[in-house]
């Protein structure tokens, strides 16, 4: 059975692969926040799970190999939100610089709203 | 609730009062930087508030394979409920009080002669709203590639060796449905109540890569 | 008589939910699922028209020939009707 040309990388059914490694990991807080953001923003109609998948697919196989699940998800959610006009890249870039300046760790940079001054 | 991966647990995680995990103290990654900034912008613009995000995390944390296990146990003991699961597994889940949202659930039953197994070859679709998060291996290349072509070989890697007179049915979640396997009720369980039966039902048995456990 | 169908062979380069390992294969409709928004439109911020969705059952021998572990094992997938052609016996 020869492979039809045009199979996209994510379309994995029937491809050769190694053994299943029964690994699992506990979810980090930031990962849960990514997941929750996806659920809430898609429920608000800003994008669909189909759009999320489309961007993940278009990201290509290298991204699948080098980035974790939630790293790819935050990239995809961002692209969908940019396409939806939820915020601009300039706004995001500016805020990312501010966040980065709050400290060194995730905990320091993700300070609760009451503690933040901008 | 037994766990298939002995090193950790998703269940019993309390969203409040949980101690900071190691990742809270790790250097901020680019992606974490994005996540914080995006969440703040969306909150300030009223698109997705912190409260909504936190409520959704609480909802996610409250879901676990234990919910699916309770559904399986009731399926085993209650013939009328069994018919309702067969007719509409989503409605039957809601009847048990599970907040499954828009989940469109189909329950596929294992018997003496049929063994079902679930996959999403195209991404990682999973009945999250009933069972919680899928395991990492479910989302990875090896499982997604091989289980639709050589399911028996994959099941053997999980320690499940099926005889030739058992038919294997693989279900690829390609669209809007989500699937739960109802594992076969183990022998020697006639005297167990629903709670004790639910304790035998593992996450992996509801994906189809394991059987339910036998009573101790 | 359960409807026998063949999955379309086309390979368009974009977001579709018909796995390539099923394209051109013959199966039988296991059940009708109703109508759902077309993911091929929803993925691109387009209004998604409702399309008929079916669960289609394939034998492993149909999919993999001699490579099938057990020819009578089956594979079920949800396929939108616009990907299915009638394949009378």
Report each predicted region and the residues it spans.
Chain B
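Terminal, compositionally biased segments used for targeting/anchoring and flexible tails
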Residues: 2-216
């Amino acid at each position: 059975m020869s492979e039809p040309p045009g199979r996209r990388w994510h379309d994995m059914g029937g491809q050769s692969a190694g053994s299943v490694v029964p690994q699992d990991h506990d979810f980090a807080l930031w990962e849960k926040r990514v997941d929750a953001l996806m659920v809430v923003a898609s429920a608000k109609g800003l994008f669909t799970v189909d759009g999320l998948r489309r961007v993940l697919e278009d990201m290509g196989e290298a991204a699948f190999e080098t980035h974790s699940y939630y790293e790819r998800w935050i990239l995809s959610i961002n692209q969908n939100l940019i396409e939806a006009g939820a915020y601009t890249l300039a706004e995001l870039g500016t805020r990312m610089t501010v966040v980065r300046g709050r400290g060194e760790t995730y905990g320091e940079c993700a300070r609760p709203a009451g503690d933040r001054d901008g | 609730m037994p766990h298939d991966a002995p090193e950790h647990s998703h269940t019993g995680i309390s969203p409040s009062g949980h101690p900071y995990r190691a990742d809270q103290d790790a250097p901020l990654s680019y992606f974490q930087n994005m996540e914080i900034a995006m969440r703040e912008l969306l909150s300030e613009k009223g698109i997705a508030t912190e409260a909504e995000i936190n409520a959704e995390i609480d909802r996610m944390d409250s879901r676990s394979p234990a919910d699916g296990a309770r559904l399986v146990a009731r399926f085993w003991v209650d013939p009328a409920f069994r018919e309702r699961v067969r007719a509409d597994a989503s409605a039957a889940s809601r009847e048990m009080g599970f907040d499954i949202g828009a989940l469109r659930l189909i329950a596929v039953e294992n018997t003496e002669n049929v063994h079902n197994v679930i996959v999403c070859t195209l991404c990682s679709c999973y009945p999250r709203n009933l069972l919680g998060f899928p395991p990492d291996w479910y989302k990875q290349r090896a499982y997604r590639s091989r289980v639709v072509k050589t399911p028996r070989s994959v099941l053997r890697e999980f320690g499940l060796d099926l005889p030739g007179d058992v038919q294997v049915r693989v279900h690829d979640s390609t669209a809007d449905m989500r699937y739960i396997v109802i594992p076969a009720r183990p022998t020697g369980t006639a005297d167990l109540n629903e709670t004790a039966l639910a304790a035998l039902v593992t996450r992996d048995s509801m994906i189809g890569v394991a059987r339910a456990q036998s009573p101790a | 008589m359960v409807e026998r169908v063949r999955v379309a062979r086309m390979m368009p380069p974009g977001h579709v939910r018909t796995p390539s390992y099923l394209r051109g294969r013959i199966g039988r409709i296991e059940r009708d699922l109703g109508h759902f928004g077309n993911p091929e439109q929803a993925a691109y911020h387009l209004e998604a028209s409702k399309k008929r969705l079916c669960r289609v059952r394939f034998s492993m021998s149909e999919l993999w020939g001699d490579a099938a572990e057990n020819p009578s094992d089956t594979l079920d997938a949800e396929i939108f009707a616009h990907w299915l052609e009638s394949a009378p016996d």
